[in-house]
Amino acid sequence: MAKISPASPLRRLAKVLGYAALRLVGNVFRPIRNPEQLQGAVWLYVVSQNNYEALHFIREALPSSVLVAGQSKQIGRYNQQVNRLSLRRKLLYYWQYPAVLWALHKTEGQRAWRFFDLVFNAIGYYEVYVRALRHYQPRAIVFANDHNDDARALLLAARACGVPTAYVQHASVSTNFPPLGFDLSLLEGQDALDKYRQCGPVHGRVELVGMPKADTFLAQKNRSPEVRRVGLAINTLDETEAVTAALHYLLREFPALTFTLRPHPGDGRDFGFLTRQYPELQFSDARQQNVFEFLGQQDALIAADTSTHLEAVLLNVASLYFRFGTHGVADDYYGYVAHGLSERAYSLPELGELLRRYQEHKPTDLYRRAAYYNATLGTPEEGHSQQRAVRLLAEWLDSRPLPAR
């Protein structure tokens, strides 16, 4: 959690001051020149590179759709390819911050002070987005993220302005997510629906469509009977020291295997020291290489809490769950171990035993473990989730009245 909100109050204050200078004040002087018309369009709202890749197929299939992000939002390699919503006026709403923080303190106690930096970031999104919706009057908004502060604010603003909303699941969900609150939700499989039902009342229509972003790759399942190439996918919650220790163990114990480290695209740490320490270690740049392209070059995946486990199993890549460190934020966060998708190792020797087993024999039907997570797996619509999602979205849009001008 320290990567998201520093434990030190002084560091949190420094983060707030940096946000105020670079984002709030910086946005005032940063021009916005959108290449596409936002008025009356179907907005595909993205908050990350992964979101962009999850929704881009809709942009290609629906001519009336445009990809949209908040001003200054980092979308990785697609920063220049999305339209931007101005956040210049966000600065005007910070007079509310003391009252909001005090109100949260009364309901949430000390947690409000612990995360005062995150509360600070969220101020003003709702009001700015209400103005934007009233100005542009989009036909509908399609989300790929349902829990970031700006995405939640846009969803609430859409409800207030009567703009229809849809949601396309882009990664695995957990029971810690907000309740499903869109007019149309296109989920990947029964796992997601079961978890959202535990989050609270499910609003609107729900359809299970499989995993659209995997369509192109499902026909390229890994049929290798043994493990020779191993990928390690890490994110900001994984501790650098633990990752280094794991690599030291694996490279020493398995000199015949090829190991590739893939940090999350949002991970800003410098892992150059690993290249110098272990010249045989390969790297995958998540900002440049699609996750399925990465997995297509692996026979096994080692990772902690990431939906890359599911994507691996869909391609018949062995999935090994191993936590890099002792942080208490998540433990089998997505339930992959509990539902038999991934096999777990609690220690490096246990991880070594699992890897040796798969080194000797990797089953060719591992992908069947993912049926609970992907509704189209093993059906005639396997590999056609994009077509199914676009068809359902188009029918839903056609059934809704056009906004009055």
Question: Model-predicted segments: where are they?
Answer:
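Active-site and donor-binding regions of nucleotide-sugar-utilizing enzymes
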Residues: 1-214
